[in-house]
C-alpha cells in the first residue's frame, strides 16, 4: 500500500496533463466497487505534517490549495484550476466515498432487474454529474456486450438490493453448467468518467479473465440474431447433438433387429428364429468335433512315438526321450536292420548254391 499511495488513480492536480498520464489502478481499487458495507472514512486534512493523501498520492510538500507548504503563488494558480469543485472532488473520491457509490450501483442494478426492462442489450448506466465511473466490459470474442455489474448480480441468484421495492419482481437466475475453457481470453474494461468534470481522467486496462462463469445467462434471442453467434452455444451444440445421434443410431439398430420383413405365409416367423439358433448349434458342434479329432490325433501320435521308442533297443530304457532323438535313433536302427537283411540274403544264396552242388555230387556217386 505504500507504493499504491504514491500512484495517480483518478485525479491529477494538473488539468493540462495528457490523456494517458493517469496510471492504471492496482487490484485493490476494484474492491471499492464491490459494495463494501463499511468503507473507511476520509482522513482529516490536518492529520499531520508528514501525512500523505491516499487519494491523490501527493505529498504535503507539493503545492496544494489551503496547504501550509509550497509557494503561495503556485497554490493560488492551482486553486484557480481546481475551481469551486475542490471540496466536492475530495468528498467524491472513489477511494473514500463508498456509500454514494454503493447507492448508485444498487440503483442501476434495481433498474436492470425491473420486470419491465428489455431482454436485449442492457441500458448503460447514465453518466451522473458527480463523476461516478460506469463500468463497461467488452469481450473481444464475437458476443453481445454486457455490463460488468450484471454477472455479479446474477451470481447472487436474484437477491434483492436495499433500494428494490417490495412489490418489484426479481428474475431468479438458474445456474447452468457451462464448459470451462482452459484458454484465457483478454477482456478490456473501460472506465469512463463524467465528461462534465474536467478533473476526471480516462484510463484503459486489459486483464485476462478465464471464461468459466457458470451463473451467466445465455444471451437474448434478439442480440444473437443481430450480432454474431456466440462460440459457447456453438461449441456445446455438437456435444448435445453427438449423444442424440448415438441414441438415434442405437434406436435404428434396435428397430432393424426387432422389425422383421412382412411374413410370406406362415413359415416366415418360423424361419427367422431357427436360423440364428441352428447357426449357433452348428458352430458349437463343429467346435466340439474339431476338438475331439485334435485330441485323438495328439493321443495317437504320442502312442506311436512311445511304440517306436520301445522298438529301438537303445531307447527302451529312456522314458523321457524327445521325439527328435526317437526319430534319429529309429532311423539308425532301421538302417542297421536293412544292412543285416542284405547280408543274410547273400548268405542264403551262397548256401543254396552249395546245396545244389552237393545234390549233383550225390547223384553222380549213386550212378556207379
From Swiss-Prot:
The keyword Nucleus applies. GO terms for biological process: regulation of inner ear auditory receptor cell differentiation. It is found in: Nucleus. Residues 285-337 form the bHLH domain. Keywords: DNA-binding, Nucleus. Residues 247-258 have a biased composition (Acidic residues). This is Protein L-Myc. The lineage of its organism: Eukaryota, Metazoa, Chordata, Craniata, Vertebrata.
Amino acid at each position: 500500500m505504500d507504493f499504491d499511495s504514491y500512484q495517480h488513480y483518478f485525479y491529477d492536480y494538473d488539468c493540462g496533463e495528457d490523456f494517458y498520464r493517469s496510471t492504471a489502478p492496482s487490484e485493490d481499487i476494484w474492491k471499492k466497487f464491490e459494495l463494501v458495507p463499511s468503507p473507511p472514512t476520509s482522513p482529516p486534512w490536518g492529520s499531520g505534517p508528514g501525512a500523505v493523501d491516499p487519494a491523490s498520492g501527493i505529498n504535503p510538500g507539493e503545492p496544494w490549495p489551503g496547504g501550509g507548504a509550497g509557494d503561495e503563488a503556485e497554490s493560488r494558480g492551482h486553486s484557480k484550476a481546481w475551481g469551486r469543485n475542490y471540496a466536492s472532488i475530495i468528498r467524491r473520491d472513489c477511494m473514500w466515498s463508498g456509500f454514494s457509490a454503493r447507492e448508485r450501483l444498487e440503483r442501476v442494478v434495481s433498474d436492470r432487474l425491473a420486470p419491465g426492462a428489455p431482454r436485449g442489450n442492457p441500458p448503460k448506466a447514465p453518466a451522473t454529474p458527480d463523476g461516478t465511473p460506469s463500468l463497461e466490459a467488452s469481450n473481444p470474442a464475437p458476443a453481445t456486450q454486457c455490463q460488468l455489474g450484471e454477472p455479479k448480480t446474477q451470481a447472487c441468484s436474484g437477491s434483492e438490493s436495499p433500494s428494490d421495492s417490495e412489490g418489484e419482481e426479481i428474475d431468479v437466475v438458474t445456474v447452468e453448467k457451462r464448459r470451462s475453457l482452459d484458454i484465457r481470453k483478454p477482456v478490456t474494461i473501460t472506465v469512463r468518467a463524467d465528461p462534465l468534470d474536467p478533473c476526471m481522467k480516462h484510463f484503459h486496462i486489459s486483464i485476462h479473465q478465464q471464461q468459466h462463469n457458470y451463473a451467466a445467462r445465455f444471451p437474448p434471442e434478439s442480440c444473437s440474431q443481430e450480432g454474431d453467434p456466440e462460440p459457447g452455444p456453438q461449441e456445446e451444440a455438437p456435444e448435445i447433438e453427438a449423444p442424440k445421434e448415438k441414441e438415434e443410431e442405437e434406436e435404428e439398430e434396435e428397430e432393424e433387429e426387432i422389425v422383421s420383413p412382412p411374413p410370406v405365409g406362415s413359415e416366415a416367423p418360423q424361419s427367422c428364429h431357427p436360423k440364428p439358433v441352428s447357426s449357433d448349434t452348428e458352430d458349437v458342434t463343429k467346435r466340439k468335433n474339431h476338438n475331439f479329432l485334435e485330441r485323438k490325433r495328439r493321443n495317437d501320435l504320442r502312442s506311436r512315438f512311445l511304440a517306436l521308442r520301445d522298438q529301438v533297443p537303445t531307447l527302451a530304457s529312456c522314458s523321457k526321450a524327445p521325439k527328435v532323438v526317437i526319430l534319429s535313433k529309429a532311423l539308425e536302427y532301421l538302417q542297421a536292420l536293412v544292412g543285416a537283411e542284405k547280408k543274410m540274403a547273400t548268405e542264403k544264396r551262397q548256401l543254396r548254391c552249395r546245396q545244389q552242388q552237393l545234390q549233383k555230387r550225390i547223384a553222380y556217386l549213386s550212378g556207379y
